């Protein structure tokens, strides 16, 4: 293993993924409160070359909490700096759903990729017509960004009606805005035209999108079932234990 100053690990690429999990909350008297979002972060160096069938992450580290986005990102950066020589990281790659707090990164040179799972999920939510769903998915998978956005506008126009209860056009335009606002991240990180440094020995680079499964196995199964409700402090403390 290569190390830099203060024995921090030297890596060429750092993969980062972030997502939010909405939890049922309660106050100090156990009275039900509005749901609040727990922020979850996973970083890793790549995938184990010898465990490709299992897609084992190398150097996986997680962080989760109920803090404000500013404080959460400060903790995230501190976690990265504690483990790695950040001056030697040549490329950071961020995968997320496009939420405003997720894109508040400290590194303007990081590559942003819109999470594929969330794109597919939004297509299914916003478009009911199966043939239109299929066309949107195909255009997305083929990396035809402009054609996808144009298709959504044409589809929205084609189903527009004066019936206020018919929300097909409105939903399609919402999907268009979501994708257009995250246009720079619609292509996978390896197809965005930036040269990615070669992986270290024993590591391979694959498609990102591990956060949903990490959420499920680490947080969701422990904190969202059996009608659980949490205080902010309790949720943060439990997240710290689960991510340790």
Each language-model region and where it sits:
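Catalytic center-proximal scaffold of phosphoryl-transfer enzymes
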Residues: 1-244
